[in-house]
A protein has these predicted regions:
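Short amphipathic recognition helices of helix-turn-helix/homeodomain-type DNA-binding modules
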Residues: 89-110
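Long, charge-rich C-terminal accessory regions
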Residues: 117-264
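Short basic helix-loop element that most often maps to the first helix and adjoining turn
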Residues: 28-54
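DNA major-groove recognition helix of helix-turn-helix/homeodomain DNA-binding modules
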Residues: 76-92
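Recognition helix of helix-turn-helix/homeodomain-like DNA-binding domains
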Residues: 54-74, 83
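Charged, alpha-helical interface segments at or near domain boundaries
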Residues: 81-85, 103-107, 117-122
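The short coil/loop that forms the "turn" connecting the two helices of the helix-turn-helix
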Residues: 44, 58-59, 88
Length: 281
């Protein structure tokens, strides 16, 4: 049995080495593989992709059955369309960029978040929206919090056959929870989202999964399936009765300082409660 295990392990390593070499010397296959991978991660089966294509890019279903078949049909226009449809980074589809998701980060400049979110609302007025605040599972928010926090914007519109289709943007890098300015900027963004009518929800992931997200090693919808729990970021703006702390007050005060620098009155977000529990469901 030991010999069988060693042989199986060796074959597995050889298979990985062959796959790496094949991708290394066949960049068109990498593009095709990533295009199919991305659509499937976003909930669109490969045989459904042709239904989404504009008339000028029409392809038969069989073209999407495998990366090897699709690579012969690739064109810059097809890849441009796929990147725009999924809101993913075009250079990642090319196998060049390290990050699959577009990143819209305005650390210490919350006015940039306000302007960008307002623009998304204007451009896609009928979508549902959700600001997700992802932190490490098991790390309670407070003075002893540790691990990274990552902010994700989700835009939900109508998909095929009455289904929902989501696009995602990363709104932060890997912000450490033990660094007060990062917590305060996170709270400021929660306040801005709330003032614009964007639902807010907190999710928890294993540390390894959070690191895969920030390193660009996993797609957001893939990690959505690996959530370990939830929490309520809006409690950092308006805590539940009897649960306020001096630490929370200091962080909210710091967040209001960043908001004021951007010409935003932090008090305007109070009294505009959103159903974060519904957003988490």
């Amino acid at each position: 049995m030991a010999i069988v295990g060693e042989v199986t392990g060796a074959l597995g390593l050889l298979g990985k080495a062959w796959a790496w070499l094949r991708d290394r010397f066949d960049p068109a296959r990498v593009q095709a593989k990533r295009l199919i991978q991305a659509f499937e991660a976003y909930g669109t089966a490969r045989q459904q992709i042709p239904r989404l294509l504009p008339a000028g890019l029409a392809l038969p279903n069989a073209a999407f059955s495998s990366p090897d078949k699709l690579k012969a049909h690739l064109s810059p226009a097809l890849l441009d369309w796929a990147a725009e449809h999924l809101a993913i980074d075009r250079s990642w589809l090319d196998g060049v960029g390290a990050q699959p998701h577009r990143i819209e980060e305005h650390y210490k400049s919350p006015g940039g978040y306000r302007d960008w979110l307002a623009q998304r609302i204007e451009q896609v007025p009928h979508a549902s929206r959700l600001l997700q605040v992802w932190k490490m599972h098991g790390s309670e928010i407070g003075p002893d919090a540790y691990g990274p926090v990552c902010l994700v914007y989700e835009e939900i519109s109508e998909g095929l056959d009455g289904s929902e289709f989501s696009r995602y943007w990363r709104l932060s890098g890997e912000w450490p929870l033990d660094h007060s300015p990062c917590v305060e900027n996170m709270i400021a963004l929660v306040a801005i989202a709330r003032s614009l009518g964007v639902l807010v929800a907190g999710h928890e992931l294993a540390l390894g999964d959070l690191r895969r997200l920030t390193a660009g090693k996993a797609l957001i919808p893939e990690l959505q399936q690996r959530r370990r729990g939830g929490w309520h970021p809006e409690d950092l703006i308006e805590p539940l009765p009897g649960q306020d702390t001096a630490w929370r007050q200091a962080r909210w005060q710091g967040a209001q300082t960043y908001l004021k620098q951007a010409g935003i009155d932090g008090a305007t977000v109070l009294g505009t409660p959103l159903d974060a529990g519904a957003a988490s469901s």
